[in-house]
Each structure stands twice: as C-alpha cells, then as structure tokens.
Amino acid sequence: MAASDAVLDKLESLKNQINYHNKLYYVLDAPELPDAEYDKLFQELQAIEQQFPELVTEDSPTQRVGAAPLDSFASIEHKRPMLSLDNVFNVEELFAFDKRIRDRINADASLEYSCEPKFDGIAASLLYENGRLKTAATRGDGTVGEDITQNMRTIGSVPLKLEGNNIPAVLEVRGEVYMPKAGFLRINEEALAKNEKTFVNPRNAAAGSLRQLNPQITAKRPLVFCAYNVGVVEGGELPATHYETLTQLFEWGFLVSEERRIAKGIEECEAYYHYLEAKRESLAYDIDGIVFKVNAFDLQERLGFVSRAPRWAIAHKFPAQEALTVLHDVEFQVGRTGAITPVAKLQPIFVGGVTVSNATLHNKDEIERLGIRVGDTVIVRRAGDVIPQIVSIVESKRPQDAREIKFPTACPVCGSDVESVEGEAAIRCTGGLVCEAQRKESIKHFASRQAMDIDGLGDKIVDQLVDNKLVNDVADLYTLDIPTLAGLERLGAKSAANLVAAIEASKQTSLDKILYALGIREVGRATARNLANHFCTLNKVMDATQEQLIEVTDVGPVVAHYVVDFFAQANNREVIEKLIAAGVNWPDIEKVDGVKPLEGTTYVLTGSLESLSRDEAKDKLQALGAKVSGSVSAKTTCVVAGPGAGSKLAKAEKLGLAILDEVGLLALLEEHGV
C-alpha cells in the first residue's frame, strides 16, 4: 500500500521538527522541548517508517543509529591532505610567527587573525554531496584515514542534511570530535559501577568511542563534533574569510566554537590567549591551546604551505602540566641510525591527563645539565601535552644511595663499540646492520607508509622476522613467502597471503621514495624529493660528491656528508643491488637540458580521477617541475578537470584557460615519462 499525501506531509513535518529540536539541543544548547515530548515525535516518525519502509532516507533522524557492526574500518583517501599545525609555546615564538608571515606578504601590524580554542580531541572530516552526508573519515596519516561514516552519523551535532541556502554541491567540513568533561565523568562512573575498565582522559574516551566497530556503542557515548575548517569545496563559493566561513557553517547546521574571535594584530591574539587560558578550567570541554589563523583566504593562499603545515596558522599550546615522581632506573635504547638514547624509568605518575612511566633524557649532555641520578625525585612535564620529559630534579630529596648514570661503553643490544662524534651530543653504536636494534628500526622505516608503504608489516612482525633470522636487511623482505610468514605468531595463512601481496605491490615505487626508504641519516621526505628531482637517477645520487650534493636545494654540508658516507659503504650498495635483483623498480626522472619540462607552469586539479589519485597526479606534475595550486587564477597554466568538477572548471572556462581531462593528463605524463 502506497503512502497517502497526508502521510508524506506528516513524515516531512516530523523530520523537520526533530531536526529543528536537534539543532536547538546539540548546536545551540537551548532546548525548548521536554525530553518526553521529543520522544513522542521520534516514536511517531519511527512508526510511519516501519509501516512504509520505502520512505526511509539516509538523512532521516531515525538513521543515526542502527547500522550493522563492521569487521574492520575501510580506508578513505582525503581529497585534500589533512595537515597538522606547527606549534609555539611562548609569546616570543608567537610574535616571531607573526613577523615571519607579515614580512612574507608585506602586511602591517593590524593583520587580522581568526582565533579559536584548540580542542583536545580527534580530528575528523565530513564530506557532503548535494547537502547530504556522504562519508566521514579520521585524519589518519593526513593522506588516508579510516572510514567512520556510520559512527559519525550517530553524533547528534553532525548534520545528516544541511539546511539553508547556497550549499556547495561538494563540501568537506573538518572539525574535532571530543567528549565533554561531564560526559566523560558519567561514562567512567557507569563503568566503575559495572566493574569495567575506565578511560584515562576525555581524549582517549573520544578516540575509543569513535573507533568502535559497532556504531550502536558509539551512539551511547556523549560525543560532540565541532567544525573548525573546510577542505574541498566544489560547485559553490565560500565567504572571503575564515571567520565568516565558520559563521556560514553554523547557518548550515554545524556546531562551531562560541569562543571564536577576530583579532587585529598579534597583541590582540596574545590577549585572547591569556583570556582563554584563564577560562580553560571552566569550559565544558578540554582544550590544549589556541589556534590563530590568518583570516583572509586570499592571504592564506599567498602564504601557502610548508611540507606538513600551513604557513598561515599556528597553535599556541598551553604550558604543560608538571608533577613530581622518582627516577627508578635508566635504560638505553638503540635507534635506526645507531643513536643510543637514555630512557628514564619512572615511578608511574598521572600528569597531563595520562599515566607516565617513561621519559626521555635525550643524551649525556642533558643528564649532566640536570645533574640527575638514579633515585632522584624529579619534575616531569608533558611538553606540548604530548612527550614526557624530565625538566629538573629536587636535590633536597636526593637519597643517600642515589647513583650516577653511567653510559655504556658497548652497545646494549649487540655489544659493538660505541663512538662519540665531534659536535654531536649522542653516542652511537658502530655495529650498523650487525646490530639487531638498528636492523629492526631500519626495516620498520623502510616499510612505513611514507616509504615503501608495505601494508600489514607492523613492528611486532618485523621483530619476529629479525629475531628468527628470517630477514637480515630490507632486501630480504622480498624473499618471504606465505608458508614462512604463516609460521609467525598471530599471523595465519590469510594474513600472510595479504602481506606477501603488499610486499609484491611495493616493488613499484619512485626514486624519491626509495631514497627516503633507505634510511640515509638526515634525509627526510622533502630532501629525498629534492635529491631525486636534481639528479634524476639513483646512480647519479650514489656517485655524487659533497660539492655536487650541496648544490641541491636544502642540502647542506652535514646532509651531503651523510649521503656520501652512506653510499660509500659496500653493504649499502649490496642491499640496493639485491633490491633491484628482487624486482624493486623506480623509474628515472626525465629532465631536458637541466630544466624540468613543466617548470614555470601552474596546474590546478579538480573533480575526481579514476586511474590515479589526485595526490599521485600532484606528485607526478611536481616531479616535472609544475606548481600545483588549490585555486584558479589568471596565472594558472592549466586546469585538470575530472567528473564532479565544479566552480574551478567554470572559472577556468571564463578565464579562457587550458583544460585537460584525465585522458589528456595521462597523455601529458606519458609524454614526459612519469
């Protein structure tokens, strides 16, 4: 039986009423309907949908809860990377940030900033298509996150359908998922009453609740989503400033911070910081600092980005919390490059929202500066509310049996000699790959997402491979088979097969990734990319002199020395030969007469691509010397437009710019051999 017009009208009326009261409750914090009356509306809507299941839509208020539990989280690639923010920890650093960006864009001291609290929660991205929630993802590694769509749908402050006018066809909204202090206390009290494990702090509670495979568990947790930024926007326009955009998001149905402010000049930013720091404890949620963003989007675009963060924003972190505890012992850990680091073993202490039992002591110089001994009472601080460190000792509490900390004269793992290098505070194991610790760390680095991206090769598996002498260097990974891997602890035949497939897939890589994966000291991702683009082949990098290396962007004498030293070692060259013999392949980069073929051009990517991701397309264009921008202007050389291209394509057509579809892009890349 089809639903009558009266039923359809009633259905829409109930949806609108419930959405209205949801906004009052979750976004405005101003409910005007008793819970019992709200429940009646909800039950009435449920009854109609049960009678006419064909009328149930994804954006119905009843669909926030009820999805079936998942076996695991799928991955979602962000259309635009979710970058982190750089931090400052004092006013001097904040003022230096302001001067740096004003000098870059020639702005006066009244530069306008948007100011808002930095929530201590979990970053998430919501993607809306035609005003309806399509997908939701965690930040992940900034490029790929976990699909948490069903869990985010259960959060009352997440609109399933946007309201208002001028909603873009595609809109990505980014924000923080957090658990209010009152909700955190309540769920811990409930857990204690049931003799269940409690959460350490609201952030952990939010993370644990958001990553439940069963959305019905997430639905019972008091989570809140607060929007703080936008990502991809297609088929629509945003206001000209960040602050106005937050206001627009509020009008579309999102919760945004009531504490946001506009500051004219860095002095007003400083005043806002002190204002919110004083108010911090009275807020309903945890914050760990303030975020300042250049307000005007056109200035943000001029400032651009560094490798991992925007130049136009900074997080001013609150002073870390400190606590007293006792140093029980010191252990020495060996890192990938052989650096031997002292780690303090502490009497567990609750500080900064977590229980701390270990802290870094950095190196011998730091231990001497502190004058610290085993048995001392120490002050522990969580620097930036993240990394525990010992900042001082309480000498008056030193016991008579306190003992000096003695650094090892031999590697604590392999027994090799240790060396002190002039100008360095660290001591290093000379064992190289003879040292199991260095072998393990080098293999973990090689397999990491930013390097060879071998999915499933976790730390514990690497430890077993080295301990069982199945792998001696990174090239040995490509000799592993399913029976060998299936014999490892907690790794069955199916997981072993998946891992072998991932290892096989990693054989096709790029020159910059293999340079980074090799683990050359001080060669990070950006330096590896610069080396690749400058020399174009691995052989040329391997044979380069220090003088030639110093000509590369951002490569100084120290890095040049490490690169030369790495390739001077016969065992490293042998590993590279073994990788090539195993079928690992990285194409050379073509460069004509020393000039990259697309140097001086600016490309813009919009819409979706089928044969490669937008990040892959961006990497390939940059490898050819092109600049890849996020917006279209008269200076744009070409716009690459895939399905779903919106306002950027329209603007390109209006400006008469060159436009390529995916076929044209692939032809361009093939022409230049990438």
UniProtKB/Swiss-Prot annotation:
Enzyme Commission (EC) number: 6.5.1.2
GO terms, biological process: DNA repair; DNA replication
Coiled-coil stretches noted in the UniProt entry, renumbered to this chain: none
First-level EC class: ligase
Domain annotation BRCT: ranges: 593-674
SMART domains linked: BRCT, HhH1, LIGANc
Entries under InterPro entries matching the protein: BRCT_dom, BRCT_dom_sf, DisA/LigA_HHH, DNA_ligase, DNA_ligase_AS, DNA_ligase_CS, DNAligase_adenylation, DNAligase_N
UniProt-annotated catalytic positions: 118 (n6-amp-lysine intermediate)
Stored SUPFAM superfamilies: BRCT domain, DNA ligase/mRNA capping enzyme, catalytic domain, Nucleic acid-binding proteins, RuvA domain 2-like
Catalytic activity: NAD(+) + (deoxyribonucleotide)n-3'-hydroxyl + 5'-phospho-(deoxyribonucleotide)m = (deoxyribonucleotide)n+m + AMP + beta-nicotinamide D-nucleotide
One cellular component (GO) term of this entry: cytosol
Annotated binding of Zn(2+), by residue: 411, 414, 429, 435
CDD domains (alphabetical): BRCT_DNA_ligase_like, LIGANc
This protein's UniProt keywords: DNA damage, DNA repair, DNA replication, Ligase, Magnesium, Manganese, Metal-binding, NAD, Zinc
Gene Ontology MF: a single term: DNA ligase (NAD+) activity
Cofactor: Mg(2+); Mn(2+)
Positions contributing to NAD(+) binding: 35-39, 84-85, 116, 139, 176, 293, 317
PANTHER family to which the protein is assigned, alphabetical: CHROMOSOME TRANSMISSION FIDELITY FACTOR 18, DNA LIGASE
Function statement: DNA ligase that catalyzes the formation of phosphodiester linkages between 5'-phosphoryl and 3'-hydroxyl groups in double-stranded DNA using NAD as a coenzyme and as the energy source for the reaction. It is essential for DNA replication and repair of damaged DNA.
Similarity field: Belongs to the NAD-dependent DNA ligase family. LigA subfamily.
Cross-referenced HAMAP family: DNA_ligase_A
NCBIfam families: dnlj, PRK07956.1
Protein name per its UniProtKB record: DNA ligase
Record organism: Saccharophagus degradans (strain 2-40 / ATCC 43961 / DSM 17024)
